Regions:
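Active-site loop-to-helix "anion-binding N-cap" substructures in soluble metabolic enzymes
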Residues: 1-430
Length: 430
């Protein structure tokens, strides 16, 4: 049974900084059981950029992040059996995990034994020989065909995944499963969900931090809680807006293609170029616009849309009020008046969640909206949470990442969580 040695509202320090554990949570953590002397299967996400010419690691960010969890389990005298993936079949960076293990070993300054096997005789023998505090890293789980093929969450259960050969072979040799792979938690693969049928499934520190920050930001962070939603993945962002508003987020600030969707939904003709982009690039765009209309009606005054925009007029920035639309030029950024209004809202917010840029920020002519809004978020005195993927990359490129309370490790996983979707790996931990 879980021990009650550690209170649920303990504070923790990770590679990404301090965080407080949720007082009310639906998952167990590494504190809830005595792990000393126990075999622990730890699933992490160290999928990294690889030089295709020599196989060298180009980025060790994820390895550093998960190293802290590996080290903590080793410090607890657990016998750590690490599972992870790298890329997928057919890709140039679909390689084994030997160099990942070597880099992690350097980071935590202790031996990590790489085993070029996943659940064959060699892997099982190494697991049988493991001692307290030792760490072994098994090979790329995606070398196993079932890890790739068994990916469907059927009939609200994980029977197919829990019956996978990898899971059935490794499970008898472990007492606990720790899932630290938040970035892959929207996937339903054996190594992520299968073990929970055989042993307690616990959240690792990276997973715990993600769930704590994202959960608080959406549902219980300091008020007023606002969300800045932009970028080109408009269908995702409109779904996120719906979930946020249902959870009590007070205001949504829109930019990018997301703003264009809401402008159309509010009855504004945004012009042929921007309309055609939505029709070609946004799947089921008519349904997305209908949902946006519904949200504007249901949550009157809570969704902020641009009052002015910047058009791309032959490569030059041209500002105009939305009343002057349609124009024959595409919308590439929010306008100055909108920018000032959004910044005032951000400055007074208790919690700010950001996902997606305000415009085509890759072009310096149209980067003003994104640069200024992201800068304002970085200066906020409230709780600041940034989605993964291109948003996290933009904050890093702008040198603002260190000023943000939490930047998510997951792109697709973060979007799924913020949209309120069922996430298989999280369901398996309940």
């Amino acid at each position: 049974p879980p021990s009650q040695v550690v209170a649920q509202n303990s504070s923790y320090v990770t590679v990404d900084g301090e965080f407080d554990s949720l007082e009310d949570r639906s998952f167990l953590t590494m504190d809830d059981y005595e792990l000393s002397g126990k075999n622990v299967i730890l699933r992490i996400d160290i999928n990294s950029s690889i030089n295709p010419e020599n196989g060298d690691l180009l980025d060790d960010t994820r390895i550093k992040r998960h190293s802290a969890t590996v080290k903590e389990l080793s410090d607890k005298n657990a016998r750590v059996i690490v599972l992870a993936h790298q890329s997928r079949p057919g890709k140039l960076d679909f390689v084994n995990l030997e160099k990942h293990g070597k880099r992690m070993s350097e980071i935590i300054e202790r031996e990590i034994k790489f085993v070029d096997d996943i659940y064959g005789e060699k892997a099982i023998q190494e697991i049988k020989n493991i001692k307290d505090g030792q760490i072994i890293l098994l090979d790329n789980v995606r070398f196993d065909k079932e890890e790739i093929n068994l990916k469907t969450f059927e009939n609200d259960n994980f029977k197919a995944q829990s019956n996978a050969k990898m899971v059935k072979t490794l499970a008898p040799h472990a007492s606990y499963f720790v899932n630290d792979a938040f970035a892959a938690s929207h996937r339903c693969q054996p190594s992520l969900v299968g073990f929970s049928d055989y042993m307690p499934a616990l959240a690792g520190r990276v997973m715990q931090r993600e769930l704590d920050f994202l959960g608080k930001a959406i549902s219980s962070g300091p008020t007023p809680r606002i969300a800045v939603l932009g970028g080109s993945k408009a269908a995702d962002s409109v779904s996120i807006a719906e979930n946020f508003l249902e959870k009590g987020v007070e205001q949504i600030l829109t930019g990018g293609v997301v703003a264009n969707i809401f402008l159309i939904a509010s009855g504004i003709d945004i012009g042929k170029p921007s309309t055609e982009f939505i029709e070609k690039q946004i799947p089921d765009h008519e349904k997305v616009i209908e949902l946006a209309k519904k949200l504007l009606s249901k949550y009157d005054g809570k969704i902020e849309i641009p009052s002015d925009v910047a058009l791309n007029k032959d490569g030059k920035r041209y500002g105009t009020n939305v009343e002057n639309l349609p124009e024959k030029y595409p919308l590439f950024d929010i306008g100055v008046d909108t920018l000032v209004r959004y910044i005032q809202i951000i400055e007074n917010a208790g919690t700010v969640i950001a996902n997606g840029p305000m415009g085509v920020f890759e072009d310096s002519e149209f980067a003003t909206g994104t640069n200024e809004i992201f800068s304002a978020i970085s200066k906020s005195k409230g709780m600041t949470v940034v989605g993964g993927g291109e948003t996290a990359m933009a904050f890093n490129q702008m040198g603002l990442a260190d000023r943000i309370k939490h930047i998510s490790t997951g792109g697709g996983a973060c979007i799924s969580f913020m949209s309120g979707e069922t996430m298989p790996a999280l369901e398996a931990m309940r």
